[in-house]
Every structure is written in structure tokens, then in C-alpha cells.
């Protein structure tokens, strides 16, 4: 696990504790989205390849499409269920920012490199996104856990909004 990609160890556990308190109080406390999450809610308009299916096809990953749609929807439902809790929004914003950063700096600029094949991209996604995110979440708690499918769903959700591209 690359320690550079782990969120400050105090951020996620503290946010999870606050989220547990927010949920236990019995009522959502927030309408709208915090700025850090709103940025990802809005679709980018400068993309030349639009839509998840088109992006996967362009990246020669169309075989992932059905699974990608399911995982994207799984994450979208989780986001919808927890969107009224500020701490959940902060957690999602941190994870989405990590995904965006890894793609912007470690994947997309290097797609033409000779050694940047699909396997290498998948290794980067696993080591710099999925494993650190699951590690940050720890055990989660009864109201909020994240698994591999949720994290991949976040990637596909961002791809749909034109923040992530494999090529």
C-alpha cells in the first residue's frame, strides 16, 4: 500500500464518527452539496468522448460495461441514501478527489507509454485507489460500509461525468 495515497489517518475515522452521530440523531441535517462534492456532481463539458459506454469502448474496455453500469448505480444509490449528511458528503468528496487525482496524474497522461497496458492501469487503480480507500474506511460502521464494488462504482460514476478517462 502506497502511504502517499492514504488519506490523513484522522480524517476518515473522524468523519465516520460524526456521520454515525448525524445518523443516530435521526434526521438529515443538510440540503444540497458541499462545494467539494458539487464539483464532481457537475458534468465536465470539455470532453471529446461522452458517456460511460463510449469511454469504455474508446479505452477498449467495453467488456466491462454491464458490470460498470451496475457498480456505478450501486454507488449512486449509496450517495443518494447518504447525501443529506455533511460528513458522508465529505467522505465521498475525499474519495472522489483521490480517484480524480490518480487518473489525472498517473493514468491519463501516460496512456501512450509503451508499458501502460490495461494490466498496468488496473494495477494503478487497485494500488492507488481501491486499496487505500478500503484501508481508510477500516471497518466502517453499521450505517456505512464500502467494498470494492462501491469504489469501482465511484470510478465509473466519475467517468460518466467526464472526470475519468482511460485513454
Where are the language model's segments positioned?
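Long, low-complexity, intrinsically disordered terminal regions
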Residues: 12-167
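Long, low-complexity intrinsically disordered regions enriched in small/polar
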Residues: 1-17
Amino acid at each position: 500500500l502506497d502511504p502517499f495515497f492514504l488519506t490523513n489517518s484522522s480524517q476518515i475515522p473522524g468523519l465516520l464518527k460524526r456521520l454515525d452521530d448525524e445518523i443516530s440523531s435521526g434526521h438529515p441535517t443538510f440540503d444540497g452539496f458541499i462545494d467539494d462534492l458539487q464539483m464532481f456532481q457537475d458534468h465536465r463539458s470539455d470532453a471529446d468522448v461522452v458517456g460511460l459506454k463510449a469511454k469504455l469502448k474508446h479505452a477498449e474496455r467495453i467488456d466491462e460495461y454491464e458490470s460498470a453500469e451496475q457498480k456505478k448505480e450501486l454507488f449512486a444509490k449509496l450517495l443518494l441514501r447518504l447525501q443529506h449528511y455533511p460528513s458522508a458528503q465529505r467522505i465521498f468528496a475525499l474519495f472522489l478527489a483521490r480517484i480524480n487525482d490518480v487518473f489525472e496524474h498517473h493514468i491519463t497522461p501516460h496512456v501512450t507509454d509503451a508499458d501502460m497496458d490495461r494490466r498496468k492501469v488496473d494495477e494503478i487503480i487497485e494500488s492507488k485507489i481501491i486499496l487505500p480507500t478500503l484501508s481508510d474506511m477500516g471497518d466502517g460502521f453499521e450505517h456505512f460500509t464500502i467494498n470494492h464494488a462501491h469504489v469501482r462504482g465511484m470510478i465509473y460514476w466519475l467517468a460518466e461525468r467526464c472526470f475519468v478517462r482511460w485513454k
